[in-house]
């Protein structure tokens, strides 16, 4: 496929991105839901599996996008989901593109801090 949508639970995206890439056409794209409750270590997940700390959100987004870059995906866009998870988790959508030749990191950077801040400013009301 040239496009894949990923929404997984109880497993890290870092465990599925490489197998998915191996099934894709070159220069394919992925839209993936980053769920902090399944990316953060158990010590960082609160009651009912909710991650409320913006610093943990930033940490897991950076971890997932760094891993994606390590397997030749460029994180081209990041946005928070306007819908919280069932227990109140804030989740994030990332658009990944199989890194084409000639694309620089500047062109693929996403502003994690701004997106996490906007998510909490909007949804923590």
Can you name each region flagged by the protein language model?
Residues 57-71:
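Short alpha-helix
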Residues 35, 88:
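Residue-level signal for inorganic ion chemistry
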Residues 1-3, 15:
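A short acidic, Gly/Pro-enriched loop at the edge of an enzyme's catalytic core
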Residues 90-125:
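Flexible, glycine-/basic-rich loop-and-beta segments that form/coincide
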Residues 14-31:
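A short glycine-rich, Lys/Arg-flanked "PGG" loop and its adjoining helix->strand segment in the class I
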Residues 36-53:
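Short, glycine-/aromatic-enriched active-site segment of Class I SAM-dependent methyltransferases
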Residues 6:
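Redox-cofactor binding/interface segments in oxidoreductases and associated redox assembly factors
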Residues 72-82:
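Conserved S-adenosyl-L-methionine
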């Amino acid at each position: 496929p040239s496009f894949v949508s990923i929404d997984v639970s109880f497993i890290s995206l870092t465990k599925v991105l490489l197998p998915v890439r191996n099934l894709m056409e070159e220069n394919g794209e992925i839209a993936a839901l980053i769920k902090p409750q399944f990316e953060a270590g158990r010590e960082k997940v609160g009651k009912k599996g909710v991650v409320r700390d913006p610093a943990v959100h930033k940490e897991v987004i950076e971890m997932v996008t760094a891993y994606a870059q390590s397997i030749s995906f460029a994180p081209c866009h990041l946005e928070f989901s306007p819908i919280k998870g069932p227990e109140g988790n804030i989740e994030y959508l990332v658009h990944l593109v199989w890194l084409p030749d000639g694309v620089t990191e500047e062109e693929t950077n996403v502003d994690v801090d701004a997106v996490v801040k906007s998510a909490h400013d909007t949804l923590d009301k």
